[in-house]
């Protein structure tokens, strides 16, 4: 419910953990999805029908509105200043007094309108200066897919079906500015596979599969959400950065930034962290 571990510790010491409540003034840990190999696996795990959505190759953003609008990354870093146009879209096209939204910001090509890879938008996240110039060079579209708080009430215990209905009632969609993720609801394998192929053709990562009755579980990998991604050909990459882990993995390098060769330079691809087994982690 809260990403503020200091607050949790203080409340635990005073035996007041029940006082932790969702608030549009503080970000929470985002809900996460398990990996599935195909539609059959999602139907088996989630039941039927399933809501399938495009999986956006963008940057996860949590949007909070109380007195003002604030934008946070999945790691709860405040990046509001880096996306002034997104704040403008939210103020203009979302009708609510206060809210917490789950979304993906994705860069797009001004000429073709097609989405650009994650690396493009990462340049904006890192930028502290010349923000307006970067906004013109790398415009973004906000794709909203969930709502956890609305007009003074937590929605985390509401079903996905109910939450999506609220989103559809308060967001005035504007292409290349602010939209809801495209979705279908089906119990048909062929329809799901067709939707997956369509997502790949249009340049997306794959699709998300969600149980219509699932509640929002902050910071957890649960069976309520699953993802089906395109299987890529093997790549030759190099590690250009490593970060130390926390807790049980403190003192070990557990997160690796990888890159591939692009002409005479290295192009950052992203981070790799999952899949490191305890037996081999001592080699890092």
Annotate the PLM regions.
Residues 274-284:
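Generic long, charged, amphipathic alpha-helical segments
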Residues 1-185, 254-272:
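N-terminal nucleic-acid-engaging modules of covalent nucleotidyltransferase systems
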Residues 64-66, 218-221, 249-254:
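Short glycine/proline-enriched turns and hinge-like loops at secondary-structure junctions
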Residues 204, 244-250, 274:
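Alpha-helical scaffold/interaction cores of sigma-54-like transcription cofactors
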Residues 31-52, 56, 189-194, 211-247:
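Flexible, glycine/threonine-enriched loop-and-boundary segments that flank and lead into catalytic domains
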Residues 3-7, 171-218:
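Metal-assisted phosphate- and nucleotidyl-transfer catalytic regions
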Residues 2-6, 78-79, 84-89, 196, ...:
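Electropositive nucleic-acid-contacting surfaces
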Residues 126, 204-205, 231-236:
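Acidic, His- and aromatic-enriched active-site or binding-groove loops in soluble protein domains
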